[in-house]
Amino acid sequence: MARKSEIVKAAVGIDYSKFEEPGGRFDYERMMREAVPHSLEEIVKIQSGMSVGDTKLLSLDNVTELARRTAGGGKGAQILVKDEAQNLSGSFKARRAALSVYEAHRMGYKGVVAATSGNYGAAVACMAARLGLKCIVVQECYDSRRVGQPEILEKQRACEAMGAEVVQLTVGPELFYETLMLLEDTGFYNASLYTPSAIAGIETLGWEIAQQCRSQLGRDPDVVVATNAGGGNITGTARGLRKAGAKSQVYAASVDLSGLHMASDHDFNRKSFTTGHTGFGVPFTVQPDRTDVPRNAARPLRYMDRYLLVKEGEVFYMTEALAALEGMERGPAGNTSLAAAFALSMTLPSDQVIVVQETEYTGAGKHPMAQLSFARRNGVEVLIGDPETEVPGKNIVLPDHPSRFKVRE
């Protein structure tokens, strides 16, 4: 760990020290300009060449109608969703992976290493396969009983299917240590979630939202809702919106897992989401430089206008509603922002527009039934009622009526 700075410098090709300033500050905008040698237009071209981006912006007419009927009184903002599941690896993470892996290839690295238990690993494996690079994905997967979460095991399957080597670890601090060891031993590129390239790759998402809203609706969205964990999603999306000249409000959304500790062996398998929750969202929002690079390019507090919280049960409910009402079966974690948008819609006038900026693919381990069954096996009750009574790690409360959805901050 004492050699972290030199290992990371060799593994990403960035000298972070030149962006430091007196008093513990650093020049964020200079870092983003100089560490990403591509314009937004060039990034769009790079991603397009890797079958990433230009995903559809879909109007959720039936979900919107449900919000309007439930709210009444002229409330119920129109809800649209950016169907990022259309990307080659099945999520918006393909955008950040495409640019990161492209940079690794451009700089002559023979392979890439990514520390992630989520969709990013599959995205890096996918892009590495397209560019002929080796890939190692490091997952925090098991508790001390060697019991792994179904969602993470699903990602193992996806990564290995695309030729990646998957290193699986138990919960705890060894993830970053093992990643540093692998970077040093292999000389591979650190395809971190938090490099400037990884964040710049998401800017195309915000830019597309603005362009597509103008084309389809003749206006910018009033609100864009982004699921928040490490902060890259909202940072990149907001930067892209700004580059498109949009003045939309940008809201973060996370699943409320208050009381659970993400490094706790006991708590690890008592949560249903590996990302997009407060266990990552809150710490990385207030202290972003707790990552595998010296300075995190994801700075959510610079860009979020509000931080909304949803309950686990609400996300599962909305996942089922999206499939039943719109014919879109998508992964639960990607519907965190949709659950927040549904609650928000019922508080806004019907002439306003909310864009949910992602969906993700679903699979056997990511499906709600797999996750709810796993929760029950780990002592978590699955109930139907008022989500306000939900206690993370003890129960999951599915709403008994759509009016139960609430805006929380």
Annotated model-derived regions:
Residues 54, 176-184, 243-329, 371-409:
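Active-site/ligand-binding loops adjacent to catalytic centers
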Residues 56, 81, 93, 118, ...:
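Buried hydrophobic positions in well-ordered alpha/beta secondary-structure cores of metabolic enzymes
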Residues 136-220, 256, 262-309:
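Small/polar-residue-rich loop-to-helix segments that shape phosphate-bearing ligand pockets
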